[in-house]
């Protein structure tokens, strides 16, 4: 059997000396995550932040939209075409995964709402409680810890979506549409080393207290990103 083709729509390009020069970019972090589980997709990266999108849904078997420090609440030239692409995936029931920014973009494209969280930044490790038992969630574990870094959140689901996971800070932590779209507000592709570097780089944004609180959550929390990546793999494989 040929490898399943996974198109990764990258909506971030970190060129900073502190982070971008020392860590793989978003698409490569996902590749590393999947490859570590010996699920080697045939990857194609689309630099959507540079207005690149697939020319056809048939170019790939499934798609994944990455996270980004950008906000769907702002005006970006790539957003309207990305929303059209998301709606096309939904209409064709094409397997689509969204993480962080991708989670929010899918919500907006399909008629949901994203707002700035009144409580401010949610940073560190947060547990998502999955409230739905589906075929791709074959592990008994239902409370998964994830790295998170966001200020915006999905405040209203699209009409056709259903909530599948919630967190203490983020009530809409994960949702699904049919059996072809699945999203998470979290970053399953982050590693502990990467997250700590990002936190250290964002002391000015978070403040000393915010940085200390987020760092403490890493020390006491658990990262279940690899487990969730197995769920993503099963979610995609269910279509083939």
Q: Where are the predicted features?
A:
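Short glycine-/acidic-enriched loop or helix-start segments at secondary-structure transitions
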Residues: 18, 74-75, 107-109, 158, ...
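Cysteine-nucleophile active-site neighborhood
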Residues: 66-132
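Amide-donor transfer/coupling interface in amidating biosynthetic enzymes
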Residues: 2-11, 29, 91, 130-240
């Amino acid at each position: 059997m040929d490898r399943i083709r996974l198109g990764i729509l990258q909506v971030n390009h970190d060129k900073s000396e502190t982070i971008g020069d020392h860590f793989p970019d978003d698409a490569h972090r996902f590749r590393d995550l999947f490859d570590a589980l010996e699920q080697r997709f045939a990857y194609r990266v689309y630099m959507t932040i540079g207005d690149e999108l697939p020319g056809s849904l048939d170019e790939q078997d499934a798609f994944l939209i990455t996270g980004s420090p950008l906000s769907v609440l702002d005006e970006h030239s790539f957003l309207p075409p990305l929303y059209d692409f998301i709606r096309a995936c939904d209409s064709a029931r094409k397997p689509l995964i969204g993480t962080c920014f991708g989670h929010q973009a899918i919500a907006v494209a399909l008629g949901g709402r994203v707002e700035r969280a009144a409580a401010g930044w949610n940073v560190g490790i947060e547990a998502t409680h999955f409230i739905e038992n589906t075929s791709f969630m074959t592990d008994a574990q239902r409370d998964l810890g994830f790295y998170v870094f966001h200020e915006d959140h999905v405040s209203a689901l699209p009409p056709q979506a259903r909530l599948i996971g919630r967190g203490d800070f983020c009530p809409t932590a994960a949702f699904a549409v049919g059996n072809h779209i699945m999203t998470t507000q979290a970053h399953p592709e982050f590693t502990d080393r990467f997250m700590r570097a990002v936190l250290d780089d964002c002391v000015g944004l978070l403040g000393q207290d915010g940085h200390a609180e987020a760092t403490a959550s890493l020390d006491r929390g658990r990262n279940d990103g690899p487990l969730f990546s197995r769920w993503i793999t099963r979610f995609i494989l269910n279509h083939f």
